[in-house]
Amino acid sequence: MTRQEIFAKLSEVFSDVFDEDITVTENTTAADIEDWDSLAHITLIAEVEDAFDIKFSMKEVLGMQNVGEMADIIEKNA
C-alpha cells in the first residue's frame, strides 16, 4: 500500500468517525479537528485498526503526535 493510499483510507476513516468531510495530511493533529477529544480518539484508533487490519501498541498510540506518525506505523505494519 502506498503512502497516498494510506492517507486516502485514513481520510475516509476520519470522515466516518467525525461525521464530516476530512482530508488528513502528515501534520494533522487533534488540535485541527474540533471534535477530536479523548473518547473520539479511542474510537478513531479502533476504526483505523479495523480499516488496516493492524493493532497499535499502547506505546505507539501514546507516541503519535500527528497523522503522519500514524501513517508511519501503518506503513511499517501493513
Features from the language model and the residues they span:
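Phosphopantetheine-dependent thiolation modules in NRPS/PKS and related acyl-activating systems
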Residues: T2-W36, A40-A46, D50-A78
